Design a protein with these regions (language model features):
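The feature marks the mature, well-folded catalytic cores of soluble enzymes
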Residues: 1-287
Length: 287
């Protein structure tokens, strides 16, 4: 019989754990709580919390809401969200990850700093991602977002650059962008960069590579919207081509299980442990 192992290092990061704990605590008191966006990029966990009374809303719905209680998830929000909350008498339950909060403050300080320098504030991140929207909001929309090294080539190298990163991005790609800017920026201006990638996320890359390489077959469990999930799954795939992205046991092709001796189950920072355990049980029942 095949050995089935769940990666101990996979599962929620502390920022997501805090957000979910806050949601559960509020729901146990009131039974109803709004959440601005999905609390986590995992549909199964979202459904579990919805059954407890959590109501996900978008920004348009938030703007129309009055006299209510709203949870802000770990990704963080731009300043406009807090202004709307005060105007509409909305009580905020702020679950912004402390790592994201520190980054927001750094970017805001850089933006409001009066140093008479014509500089570009650049954020390496995914355009439209909730965290990135919150970061760009600290600069009243002036920050430049780049998603990959190729996009860094269109920066104005005659102006100073301050480079930051979305907390869940790839450290390798960030370092490539840093090296490219160093090589191309004018000697008359300044370049400062801040490695703001969360170490709890970055450290998972070498660990998940090791885990994936130690199994014949790997099921990476993640919601399709998870940026971190995409990065970690790609790392699994690099070391073990027999890695498969799933978000539930229903997506497992039973033919993959035939003749396999070792099966690994791992996931993103937005993947609940209970879901990986559920998938492990389903696999064991089929082999």
């Amino acid at each position: 019989m095949a050995k089935v192992e769940i990666d101990e290092g996979s599962g929620f990061c502390f920022g997501v754990v805090t957000a979910i704990n806050k949601a559960e605590e509020e729901l146990s008191k009131s039974g109803t709580l709004y959440c601005l966006g999905d609390i986590v990029h995992n549909s199964r966990e979202v459904e579990r919390l919805k059954a407890m009374g959590l109501i996900p809303i978008n920004h348009e719905e938030f703007n129309r809401l009055h006299n209510a209680k709203v949870l802000l998830r770990a990704h963080g929000e731009p300043p406009e969200t807090y202004i709307t909350a005060r105007r509409n008498n909305i009580e905020i339950i702020d679950a912004t990850c402390p790592v994201v909060l520190r980054l927001q403050k750094k970017i805001k300080q850089e933006y409001i700093q009066e140093d008479n320098e014509d500089k570009q504030i650049v954020i390496y991140g995914k355009n439209g991602h909730a965290e990135v929207l919150g970061l760009v909001g600290q600069t009243t929309g002036k920050a430049i977002v780049i998603e990959k090294l190729e996009e860094a080539k269109s920066l104005d190298f005659s102006k100073s650059i301050r480079l930051y990163s979305q907390t869940t991005k790839s450290l390798d790609e960030f370092q490539k962008i840093v090296e490219y800017i160093k090589e191309h920026i004018s000697s008359d201006v300044t370049f400062e960069y801040y490695d703001t990638i969360c170490r709890q996320v970055a450290n998972r890359i070498p660990n998940i590579r090791k885990f994936a390489a130690s199994h014949d077959l790997v099921f990476f469990v993640s919601g399709k919207k998870s940026s971190n999930g995409k990065i970690l799954f790609n790392e699994c795939k690099k070391v073990n081509p027999n890695s498969h992205l799933i978000d539930s046991a229903e997506e497992i092709d039973n033919r993959l299980l035939i003749g396999t001796e070792s099966i690994g189950i791992c996931g993103a920072t937005s993947t609940p442990k209970w879901l990986m355990e559920e998938i492990s049980k389903a696999i064991k029942s089929r082999i």
